[in-house]
Amino acid sequence: MAKQTPLYDQHVACGARMVDFHGWMMPLHYGSQIDEHHFVRQDAGMFDVSHMTIVDLHGNRTREFLRYLLANDVAKLTQPGKALYTGMLNESGGVIDDLIVYFLSEDYFRLVVNSATRDKDLAWISQHAEPYQVEVTVRDDLALIAVQGPQAQQKVATLLTTEQQQAIAGMKPFFGIQTGDLFIATTGYTGEAGYEIALPKQQVVAFWQQLLAAGVKPAGLGARDTLRLEAGMNLYGQEMDEKTSPLAANMGWTVAWQPEDRQFIGRAALERQRMKGTEQLVGLIMTEKGVLRNELPVYFFDAAGNQHVGVITSGSFSPTLGFSIALARVPAGIGEHAVVQIRNREMPVRVTKPGFVRAGKAIVL
């Protein structure tokens, strides 16, 4: 039977259509996915992301452990609260998961990992933590709400104490701080400003209701997906998985090659892939009528006139732009134009870098 977050009854009360999402009953939408999408882009929406897993790591060798476990380098994290995005790779360079890691103190780091990968993530982390004597604590006592949009931070501030407001004042993107019972982070999955807020489960219903009263509208998985796609953000299981290199998933920037003597899991395989070359993740735009969908083939000719084929990993109508967009994994050598086979029609598409909308504005036109 699918699990429920502490906010399940709140979703039902808000009119949500609930669906099974990787073993969790989650809201797909509350009546209109498009309206929810626009409200996040223009005002402030909130997502229940309590199905995600928060993992706290304690121990004197935690930083050393994470420098081995993760492809990005936590040595970059010198200011308490600072966070970074990274892949956690297997020995063949495939992505076990993508996650955010927060540096809270020298012997205390926090990870936020995906729900669909929870069991394998926890097994992998625990297995490799043991030699470093790092204590792994799964924070199932916490719920998690993402409040996103240009008015999100302003509306959240109305619910905070003076001390909490002062604690987060001027906090830059990709930081997190514990203030009172709230862990408030300037992270998100929409391309908008906002917070991701972890708090004790028994307090989350009241906090949700306060957000509603402050004019923050609930948004479901449908809007979350179109928002992250517009922002060019990966979804685990679509843009990458255990057989996909981060170099083929627009995650090359998350691999810290320096210093050269840092050995992290998957490094040797990645170095071979970097020498050999990999496929690449690109953006696609189709302004003609129709919708780009996952798994549709993408055809193009390289400079020598040879035809190649790739595949759409995520595709949808873009509510902000008013036409269809996609992310696609393609062989190297693609130019500015390609063709997507939709049923029996060959539809022309424009090739871009991943990422179509930032801070509510088109960045591809």
Swiss-Prot record:
InterPro entries attached to this UniProt entry: GCS_T, GCS_T_bac, GCST_C, GCV_T_N, GcvT/YgfZ/DmdA, GcvT/YgfZ_C, TrmE/GcvT_dom1
Catalytic activity: N(6)-[(R)-S(8)-aminomethyldihydrolipoyl]-L-lysyl-[protein] + (6S)-5,6,7,8-tetrahydrofolate = N(6)-[(R)-dihydrolipoyl]-L-lysyl-[protein] + (6R)-5,10-methylene-5,6,7,8-tetrahydrofolate + NH4(+)
Pfam families in the record: GCV_T (PF01571), GCV_T_C (PF08669)
UniProt cross-references to SUPFAM superfamilies, sorted A to Z: Aminomethyltransferase beta-barrel domain, Folate-binding domain
GO cellular component: cytosol; glycine cleavage complex
E.C. number: 2.1.2.10
One BP term from GO: glycine decarboxylation via glycine cleavage system
Function, as annotated: The glycine cleavage system catalyzes the degradation of glycine.
Protein name: Aminomethyltransferase
Lineage, top ranks: Bacteria, Pseudomonadati, Pseudomonadota, Gammaproteobacteria, Enterobacterales
Gene that encodes it: gcvT
